[in-house]
């Protein structure tokens, strides 16, 4: 894919043709009394506003604590994000770039993080190249390419850490990036604590009633399953955040079905947690012979983030096997080295 094709796909070009998601911000942390007029009064200082709404409880008509502001161009959004913190109705609120509905099939979209996950990393990519490229979105504090422990070659993904979560949001909205002549796709690189927060957000949004256009959920609605941290799963191959498994396993949501709440076939993992032949992974999803999810039953064992392994390794969050596992379940006692601050080659 060429730079021109990347720009066309990402909606770059004339401000009048900019996609709405590049011109919209989500504003959380509003008081129950915040009105559209109060939001407009504050955000009009950054430029022309084309639409504004405070999401309200259908019964009480009071603010549900968040809303959206759409500007006439992306430059107004940039100006607003540079002038944080924002104080509306006497309270510091939480503005961030809005995620379009067609991308909103992952609850983590509304969780802020300073770390960016980068897929499509090739052997001719270096950490310095990642730093040089992504510096245009903000100050990069760290870049790392994840290597295979045996071959010392890139496993196809890496991470870039910024000093501000808004830099990550800008990169995610851009979708695809050309780094050293190769297309790289990005998403938020959430920690397990941030993933837990994302799930709580998802649960809260599900209970929050309908949005203005009738879609269930709060922050632009909810959605289905995610992709894989480290690319598609291979039968018998290594997992993303975990050791090798027997049958098939996935990365963050897996490749043999889907992520949160989506049904899958065969075997699959959650956070890179490999599975043996049967059993579901992900958050509450079903597949094969058992259910995964947060503590869901799996072959008469408790499942974790992606469920337990059939062998000696236990599950992740809440998962138990014969031994305690790591993130999503790992073989034996080996845990994800990066999470422990150890060797980066995993």
Swiss-Prot record:
Residues 332-346 have a biased composition (Low complexity). Residues 92-107, 189-215 have a biased composition (Basic and acidic residues). Keywords: Chromosome, Nucleus, Repeat, Ribonucleoprotein, RNA-binding, Telomere. The keyword Nucleus applies. It is found in: Nucleus; Chromosome, Telomere. InterPro entries: Nucleotide-bd_a/b_plait_sf, RBD_domain_sf, RRM_dom. Residues 23-123, 114-191 form the RRM domain. Residues 216-296, 303-331 have a biased composition (Gly residues). One of its GO terms (cellular component) is catalytic step 2 spliceosome. One of its GO terms (biological process) is hemidesmosome assembly. Its main location: nucleus. This protein is a component of ribonucleosomes. Overexpression gradually increases telomere length, leading to increase lifespan. This is Heterogeneous nuclear ribonucleoprotein A1. It comes from Caenorhabditis elegans. The gene is hrpa-1.
